């Protein structure tokens, strides 16, 4: 018999210890990985609920199982909130991840072998936008586009590639691009050749929801996002659209279920619903504005300290530090900062001479530190510490000194107060 007092700590000490150690790590490390964030206790409450027990294949009102009257309410709340938040008239909240959402869009709109324009991974794109190691690069004929010498998307080259290759789809979106994308221009290019414009806004969805970054929904045929990252919800995916046909929406739904998934994760969908409600609050807008301010503040310090930032700045939550001129690898920088309890990720930079496993850059993002309460002053101080470590990458005394400062500021700005 199941009893409510059952717990992991008493039953599985080995697992519980690892979970507790991760909790401590999150509190005592500064998180600067651009795709990571801290979700609210409300979201975690939803994910740890009895909704995890319920199978609900199908969609609200059209399920293959009985007993779905309450999970229908949960999913419909998530759908309605997603549509309201992003100005969409279609939303599918079932994708288990951003990659699953992207797979569903490709399945709905493309045939294997179709030509697709996607942002070059080395220029800031994402694995699922046509990388040869990913399903997207294996199933479709991918033509990459990239950034120009200033570090911004080269729309002239994009248009030229589009007219030359006549792709069935153009993919907008990125995983390591710090500029503002001109969604209207991309739609104009797509329309000129009769292609779909599909936008993956996973990285900037929270900024979009708060009006801090341009919304692609009015411009794209289809938009996907993750529900974590800047949106600060549970790990999962979401598909949105506006002004499309019922036929398109049926195709998208069918591509998710039964095309790519079986039963939806109702406990995660409940987490999405509450996160979407949180994203409608005034304080969420203030938070996203601060995310962007903190990123700019950090860039300022890196530039002052003689570090090169790809595209020279940032207009969102992330930026890339190019370490080629410093004769450092991203792998070395990642490891040294990690020893100071500062977590970043190594990242390729444009025309990177190193392999993707070594790289010549680091990606820095501000969603998590801002969630802790950091403002510009703390962001600048942190950037200075990072430069101290990178300037003396083999000096363990410097790294230890910075680690002490990190532990102090983490205690002053707890993740969960």
Swiss-Prot record:
Residues in coiled coil: none
Pathway membership, UniProt: One-carbon metabolism; tetrahydrofolate interconversion; Amino-acid biosynthesis; glycine biosynthesis; glycine from L-serine: step 1/1
Principal place of residence: cytoplasm
Alphabetical UniProt keywords: Acetylation, Amino-acid biosynthesis, Cytoplasm, One-carbon metabolism, Pyridoxal phosphate, Transferase
Binding site for (6S)-5,6,7,8-tetrahydrofolate: 121, 125-127, 355-357
Compartments, record wording: Cytoplasm
Pfam families found in the cross-reference section: SHMT
PTM annotation (N6-(pyridoxal phosphate)lysine): residues: 229
GO biological process, one term: glycine biosynthetic process from serine
Modified residues (N6-acetyllysine): 54, 250, 285, 354, 375
Enzyme kind, highest EC tier: transferase
Reaction equation(s) it catalyzes: (6R)-5,10-methylene-5,6,7,8-tetrahydrofolate + glycine + H2O = (6S)-5,6,7,8-tetrahydrofolate + L-serine
Site (Plays an important role in substrate specificity): residue numbering on this chain: 228
GO function terms (MF aspect): glycine hydroxymethyltransferase activity; pyridoxal phosphate binding
GO cellular component: cytosol
Subunit structure: Homodimer.
Function: Catalyzes the reversible interconversion of serine and glycine with tetrahydrofolate (THF) serving as the one-carbon carrier. This reaction serves as the major source of one-carbon groups required for the biosynthesis of purines, thymidylate, methionine, and other important biomolecules. Also exhibits THF-independent aldolase activity toward beta-hydroxyamino acids, producing glycine and aldehydes, via a retro-aldol mechanism.
PANTHER family cross-referenced by the UniProt entry: SERINE HYDROXYMETHYLTRANSFERASE
Name listed for the protein in its UniProt record: Serine hydroxymethyltransferase
Source organism of this protein record: Shigella sonnei (strain Ss046)
